[in-house]
Amino acid sequence: MKLSPIIVALDYSNPKKAISFSKKISPDQCQLKIGHELFINSGFFLINFLQKNGFKIFLDLKLYDIPNTIKKTIFSLAKFGIWMVNVHASGGYNMMTAAKDALSHINNPPKLIAVTVLTSMEKSDLSKSKIFTKIINHVIHLSNNAYKCGLDGIVCSPWEAEKVRKKFGNNFIIVTPGIRFKNTNYNDQKRVMNPYDAIKSGSNYIVIGRPITKSSNPYLLLEKILSKLNNI
């Protein structure tokens, strides 16, 4: 069955609120993303609960460490049946290769993707890190490393999705946060796009958090978004 292109970011600190939200939507509408704060506060209890209720889980921990540590961590996480997990592409070739190698020992391994440049960043942020190039060039560079390491795909902003898709083909997964609707608050996001243009640009999965989790009727909102996406 083809998965929904929507990943909802569970931007909660309290697992009870995440559970309450999950009961308002359906697993066929989206996958769910769990980040650092919620994972620390809930552990695998929440993941198990959501999986038992039919949801696929993207564990967004953006792992970044020495290769041996990453290999052991990915191996341990994969045993919990998560759908997708990520590492930082900036961790380097050896780290990403170690992460990929860990999954060779797992039946039905999760998708392994690499974070390129955070959607909260702009060119001046790269310059402060002594990276003097355009964001798109750095995203392509990091994506190329992930591709060579055999990862399933990358995370980038929708601004870079079209060029990443063109360079790495249709089998390379592109996950794009920074999804916002017209006339909504960008919060801490800088490189943003509406969900429909993001999919047109080549994204496989769009990550939407607050616009959906703070909606008075998230089920209906998801249905409206999916209906429009199905016509693209």
UniProtKB/Swiss-Prot annotation:
HAMAP family tied to this protein: OMPdecase_type1_B (MF_01200_B)
Family of the protein in this entry: Belongs to the OMP decarboxylase family. Type 1 subfamily.
InterPro entries xref list: Aldolase_TIM (IPR013785), OMPdecase (IPR014732), OMPdecase_AS (IPR018089), OMPdecase_bac (IPR047596), OMPdeCOase_dom (IPR001754), RibuloseP-bd_barrel (IPR011060)
EC supergroup of this enzyme: lyase
Lineage: Bacteria, Pseudomonadati, Pseudomonadota, Gammaproteobacteria, Enterobacterales
NCBIfam families referenced in this protein's UniProt entry, alphabetically: PRK00230.1, pyrF
Subunit field text: Homodimer.
Active-site residue list: K62
Designated name of the protein: Orotidine 5'-phosphate decarboxylase
PANTHER family the record matches: OROTIDINE 5'-PHOSPHATE DECARBOXYLASE (PTHR32119:SF2)
This protein's UniProt keywords: Decarboxylase, Lyase, Pyrimidine biosynthesis
Substrates-to-products reaction catalysed: orotidine 5'-phosphate + H(+) = UMP + CO2
Pathway: Pyrimidine metabolism; UMP biosynthesis via de novo pathway; UMP from orotate: step 2/2
Matching PROSITE patterns: OMPDECASE
Record bears the keyword Glycoprotein: no
Any one GO biological process: 'de novo' pyrimidine nucleobase biosynthetic process
Cited function: Catalyzes the decarboxylation of orotidine 5'-monophosphate (OMP) to uridine 5'-monophosphate (UMP).
Binding site for substrate: 11, 33, 60-69, 119, 180, 189, 209-210
EC number, UniProt record: 4.1.1.23
Gene that encodes the chain: pyrF
Pfam families to which the protein is assigned, alphabetical: OMPdecase (PF00215)
